[in-house]
Structures are given as structure tokens and as C-alpha cells.
């Protein structure tokens, strides 16, 4: 749902071409008024507000500067353009004030519904459940064990990887005794991994 200010912007969003004859615009105004009344009867307040506002805006702001209205004089009282000017003036005098009252009534209804919807949406937003009795859980972080560099373990690891790579290069001599010796070297010289301790 939109507010009345947003609907006014929607109602003013149309093109006006002064080259179109005045009689066409007068028929268009009548069509806009009929659409507004149909939307109001269908209980579509937003759409009826847009059509009523567009009707008033077209008559008062756009058609008042139409070239056919500006170049008419009283001497051409028998021409069809004079009849269109009189029809335009009747719409301005008789219908526009009544439509303005309808617009104001619709504006109050739309703004009331819009504010109710906004407060309803604001009340339905989830809020954090803060209980005074609960205390936040504090996670204690255990310090990592301090271990300095052990040169002996490092050298042992390097020699282990060298033996493995040399054993893979010597694939030609793969007797049973070499395989068991390599397995024995693997078990004896595997680098020592740091021990993880978990406090409970």
C-alpha cells in the first residue's frame, strides 16, 4: 500500500501533448472521471484517488495552458472551439470543486489506512528476547602450548623424507628385506607431532 504522497506522484505521471485538440482532452477527462467512479465503487481507494487527482490535475494545470483555450476570443461565439471552451469552464466551475472534496476525503482514508499498516508492521518486527535472569555465556579460550623449535626433531623429519624419496627412486631393487627395512625406518623415524590437550 502507498501513502497519498506516493499516489499523487503516480497520478501526475502522464504525458500531456498540447498538439492534441481540446475536444479530445475533454472526452479523456470524462473517461478518467468514469474510471475513478468505477474504482471507487469497487472499493479500490488508491486507484480512485489516482484517477480523481489526475482528472483535477489535467483540468486545472495542463488544459488551462492549452493553445486552443489561449487563442479564443468572444467574437467566435458560434464556432465549435467556443463550445469546447464553455464545456471546459463548466467542468472547472461545477465538477472540480466536488472532485476536490472527494480527493480530500480519500486522502484522509488512505493516510489513515497507511499509518495503521505502518504501525502494524512495526509491531510485528521480531525483537530480541532479553531476560534479566540469564547471564551471557563466556567462552574461555585455552592458551596454545608453548613449544620452542626442536632442531633434533626437525633434522629427524628431514632425514625421514629423504629416506622415503631415496627408496622410491630405487624401485629396481625391491626385495623383501628392503621393504621391511623401509617399514622399520618409517616406524622409528616418523616425526613427532605436537600433542593436543583438551581441558574438561
From Swiss-Prot:
GO molecular function annotations of the record: cysteine-type endopeptidase inhibitor activity; enzyme inhibitor activity
Disulfide bond entries: none
Cellular component terms per the entry's GO annotation: endosome
Main location: other
Keyword Membrane carried by entry: no
Subcellular location: Endosome
Keyword entries, A-Z: Endosome, Protease inhibitor, Thiol protease inhibitor
GO BP annotations listed: ubiquitin recycling
Family, similarity comment: Belongs to the RFU1 family.
Subunit annotation: Interacts with BRO1 and DOA4.
Additional free-text comment from the UniProt record: Present with 377 molecules/cell in log phase SD medium.
Physiological role: Inhibitor of the DOA4 deubiquitinase involved in the regulation of protein degradation by the proteasome and maintenance of a normal level of free ubiquitin.
Name listed for the protein in its UniProt record: Regulator of free ubiquitin chains 1
